[in-house]
Amino acid sequence: MEKMSRVTTALGGSVLTGRTMHCHLDAPANAISVCRDAAQVVVAGRSIFKIYAIEEEQFVEKLNLRVGRKPSLNLSCADVVWHQMDENLLATAATNGVVVTWNLGRPSRNKQDQLFTEHKRTVNKVCFHPTEAHVLLSGSQDGFMKCFDLRRKDSVSTFSGQSESVRDVQFSIRDYFTFASTFENGNVQLWDIRRPDRCERMFTAHNGPVFCCDWHPEDRGWLATGGRDKMVKVWDMTTHRAKEMHCVQTIASVARVKWRPECRHHLATCSMMVDHNIYVWDVRRPFVPAAMFEEHRDVTTGIAWRHPHDPSFLLSGSKDSSLCQHLFRDASQPVERANPEGLCYGLFGDLAFAAKESLVAAESGRKPYTGDRRHPIFFKRKLDPAEPFAGLASSALSVFETEPGGGGMRWFVDTAERYALAGRPLAELCDHNAKVARELGRNQVAQTWTMLRIIYCSPGLVPTANLNHSVGKGGSCGLPLMNSFNLKDMAPGLGSETRLDRSKGDARSDTVLLDSSATLITNEDNEETEGSDVPADYLLGDVEGEEDELYLLDPEHAHPEDPECVLPQEAFPLRHEIVDTPPGPEHLQDKADSPHVSGSEADVASLAPVDSSFSLLSVSHALYDSRLPPDFFGVLVRDMLHFYAEQGDVQMAVSVLIVLGERVRKDIDEQTQEHWYTSYIDLLQRFRLWNVSNEVVKLSTSRAVSCLNQASTTLHVNCSHCKRPMSSRGWVCDRCHRCASMCAVCHHVVKGLFVWCQGCSHGGHLQHIMKWLEGSSHCPAGCGHLCEYS
C-alpha cells in the first residue's frame, strides 16, 4: 500500500514534489544514480540498464541503454554513476572488468562512448571527480585503482593498494586531489591523485572487508565506512592519525552508506544480506535508528538521496526488481516502539539497569526530572516530529555488583584455558573436557560431554575406568561394561536361544539382578517378557551401574588373566521360586566338555550356586554392536547446543561445534554458527585470552570466522641498511635502493617465510638455512658466528 503524503521542497529556482512510490523493474538492480537536476535516475544491473524520469506521481521509463541483438558482458553492470557536472555523461563498471562511459547526447540509439579494458577482474566501483569534468576513477577486484582522463584512450595513472580487492573509491568533496579507497582486508587508504606510487595514509577500519565509504558533504574530514562486521564508523581524517568519532552497530553487513543532506549527523545504510530495510541513523544515538523504510522485499542494493540539498527524498533499488522513492515523513520510527528500559551484564557479572527517570521516581516517590528551565518556555524551539530527539529525557542508571566470592567468571577463564578442542581422538577430547567441567563444579556440562562420547564413539573406544560398577555392600569392584560376563566353573549347558526372564511389574532400583536361583526359560511363550529380543546367546541385564546394558554369557571365551571380582552371595536377592531343580554341580562338571544343549533338549535350565566362592564374574567383550547411528541423535545434539546458547553459555556451544566438526555442522545453519563463534571470540578477547581466541578462529568450521586471522594484519618492514620504512615497494628501499631480506645462501630476496639467527641476525629461506646447517655450523653469511637451528 503506497502512502499518500506529499512533500514540496523549494531548492533555488527548482521545486521538488513527490510522494512515497515505487515501480517494477524488468530485472534486479545492482546500483542506482541520480541526475544533478534530481529529475531522472539511472538503474543498472546484470540484465537492466534504464533511465527513469521521476515525476510527481510515478516513475516513467525514458531510455533503455541495452541496445543490440547480442547480449554483451559490457552491459552487465556492477555499478553506475551519473556525472554531477554533465547531465549527458554516465559511467558503468562491468562485471568483466571493463569501464564504459555513455554519452546521452549522441544522436544514435547506441549511447556507448568509450571502453577502458585495463582491469583484469570485476570492477566494483566507478566515481567521477566532483569538480573535474574529465576525471574518472575506478576500483577493481584485481586490487588496482585506475584514474582515467576521458579525453584519452588509456588510464593516466594506476594505484596499487598492495592489498586485496578494492570495494569502494570516493573522491573527497572538499579536497581536490584526495580520494579514499576501501579494501577486502579491512583497510582504508587515502591517496593523492598526483602521487600514484604510495598512499598518503592507511589504517585498519573494520574487522573484515570494508564494503563502502562516503565523505561528509559539509565537514571536510569526516569519512563514513561500513563493513562486514555490521558496523558503520565515522572517522575524523583531519588529525595526524585517523580518529574514530562515532560507531553505529547494525544487525547485518553494511553494503551502502550515504550521508543525509542538510543533516550533519544523519546517514542512511542498507545491508548486503538478511536485512531488507533501509535505516537512517543519528550517529549520536547509535543504538536505535532515527527512521526505517520497509518497502523492499529483498536485499537493497543501491541508495541515493534525490538532491544534495534536500533531506526529504531517498531513492533505492533492490534485488526484488523494484525502484522506490521514500518520503522521510512516511518512514517508521523504531524509537517509538523501542523498550525504554535497558539491561546489560558486565564482564565480571555486574548488572546495569537503566530506566526513565519518571518510572524510577514513581517507584521511589521522588520528583521526576522536568528538564532545564533557565529560559522561559516561550523561547523553546518547536521541534520537528521527524527528528529523533523530540523532547528532553532523563534516565536513571542502577548498577548491581556481584558479591565477593559469590561467583564471577573465573570458571569461564579456567574452562577456556583448560579445554582440549583438537589434537586427540574424539573420545579423549570428550573425557578430558568432562573432567575439566566436573572439577569446576559444572556437572551438567560434564554429563553432556560424557553423553557426546557415548553417542559418537564406538564401544571399544569408551574407557572402562569411567564405567565401573559398585556391587555389594562390603566394597566396590571394577566390572568393565563393554565386555561379557563369564561365570567361573560354569558348564556350557544352556541353549543358545535362552533368554533371561524378567517378571512384569517388578520394581527394581539399585540391586544387581543376577540371582543365584534365577530361572532361564526357553519356551516360545516367553515373547511377552520384558527385556531385549535380540538373538544372542545368554543375556544378562540390569547390572547396577551408569548404563543399562545386556551382556553375553560365553564360557568358551573365558580368560583366566582377566581381572576378577568376588561378589558376595547376598548381593543377589532371590527373584522367584525355582521352577525345576537341576542336577547338582557335580553333574555339570562331568559334562563340562559336552556341546551346548539346544532348546529342544532342555526345556528348563537354571543357575544354582555351587558354593560360597561361586559368584565370580569376569568381562571379555561386548554382547552386540547393534547401536543407533550417531545421525539418529543429530536433532537432539542440535537442540542441546541451542539450549546452551540461549542460556548464555556460548562457550559450550562453540566447543562442541569444534570437537564434533562435520558430525553436527550440517544440522545447524551457517549464520547461527557464525553468530556463536563471533560471540565467543568477543568474550575471549574481552578477557584477554588471545591465544585461546586465535585457536578458536583456526579451528572454526565457519568460513567467515576462519578467515579472521587473514584480515586486518599489517606488516611494517624497514630497510636493514638505512632503517627507512618500506611501505611503497615491497622489497626495494627508496633511499638506498637495496633489497631487503636477502637470503645468506642464495642471495635472493626472501618473499615468504624468513628465518634468522638471533645471534648474528643473518638468515634466509627456511629450507636453505636448514640444508646449510646440516653440513656446517658456521653462519652462511661468513661472519664466523656459530649458528644453530632448533
Curated annotation (Swiss-Prot):
The modification Phosphothreonine is found at residue 581. Its main location: membrane. GO terms for molecular function: ubiquitin protein ligase activity; zinc ion binding. Pfam families: WD40. Its EC number is 2.3.2.27. Zn(2+) 3 binds at residues 757, 760, 785, 787. GO terms for cellular component: cytosol; GATOR2 complex; intracellular membrane-bounded organelle; lysosomal membrane; vacuolar membrane. The modification Phosphoserine is found at residues 155, 470, 496, 594, 598. Pathway: Protein modification; protein ubiquitination. Zn(2+) 1 binds at residues 719, 722, 733, 736. A zinc finger (C4-type) spans 718-740. Zn(2+) 4 binds at residues 762, 779, 783. It catalyses: S-ubiquitinyl-[E2 ubiquitin-conjugating enzyme]-L-cysteine + [acceptor protein]-L-lysine = [E2 ubiquitin-conjugating enzyme]-L-cysteine + N(6)-ubiquitinyl-[acceptor protein]-L-lysine. Phosphorylation at Ser-155 by AMPK in response to glucose deprivation inactivates WDR24 by promoting interaction with 14-3-3 proteins, such as YWHAG, preventing assembly of the GATOR2 complex. Keywords: Autophagy, Lysosome, Membrane, Metal-binding, Phosphoprotein, Repeat, Transferase, Ubl conjugation, Ubl conjugation pathway, WD repeat, Zinc, Zinc-finger. It is found in: Lysosome membrane. PANTHER family: GATOR COMPLEX PROTEIN WDR24 (PTHR46200:SF1). Belongs to the WD repeat WDR24 family. Catalytic component of the GATOR2 complex, a multiprotein complex that acts as an activator of the amino acid-sensing branch of the mTORC1 signaling pathway. The GATOR2 complex indirectly activates mTORC1 through the inhibition of the GATOR1 subcomplex. GATOR2 probably acts as an E3 ubiquitin-protein ligase toward GATOR1. In the presence of abundant amino acids, the GATOR2 complex mediates ubiquitination of the NPRL2 core component of the GATOR1 complex, leading to GATOR1 inactivation. In the absence of amino acids, GATOR2 is inhibited, activating the GATOR1 complex. This is GATOR2 complex protein WDR24. It comes from Homo sapiens.
